[in-house]
């Protein structure tokens, strides 16, 4: 059966797929971080179907991780071949450009809110972008109101989740549980003993949620890349996607 979503799909599943289809023919392509969540958001197979060449999947995880095994196994099962594999790629690595090289199209979504220094991460990503960058982050609404209370976020806001406590935490936890079945007590833990702690062996972890931005604050950060915004879209006032081109 031909899947309508995920690896091997034959039609665009969202706006990001449409962006890729518009520029993929004859261009190199890398998807950074696309093996997560059962590879449901991977873009390699779609980019290849749309005519991209030198297509690669990169991720911070080592090749022996279960997520790589699932990704590669599903690729084989669905007849997708000739995808280059780049394990152990950290977007915060000062040597990223040397390790990964440059691709015409860089797709890096689902990453920035997991990183402790997202502006640094964006600037580092720019070093591997030949022409186009597709990225996103989780955004906070201007106003959140529910049974736990009410919080307004000024346009320039960036929310540091390790510091989230008290009423603000209660309001936002209820918001994300009700709308997306996401529990901030798991993804943005408060104390010791968490399954995804913020610091592991003295180093920041890339697994919990670190930062949420307002849409305007995120786009202001993107301006630092000195790239031109071609298009944008927001999914359910929650995930903000931006399609950029180098000047």
Region annotations inferred by a language model:
Residues 69-98:
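S-adenosyl-L-methionine
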Residues 36-52:
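Conserved SAM-binding loop of SAM-dependent methyltransferases across substrates and taxa
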Residues 54-62:
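Conserved SAM-binding motif I beta-strand of class I
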Residues 103-117:
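A short SAM/SAH-binding and catalytic strip from SAM-dependent methyltransferases
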Residues 26-38:
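Conserved class I S-adenosyl-L-methionine
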Residues 116-246:
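S-adenosyl-L-methionine-dependent methyltransferase catalytic module, highlighting the catalytic core
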Residues 6-27, 42, 46:
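Conserved alpha-helix/loop element of class I SAM-dependent methyltransferases that forms part
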Residues 19-22, 93-101:
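Short amphipathic alpha-helix with an adjacent loop that forms part of the alpha/beta core around
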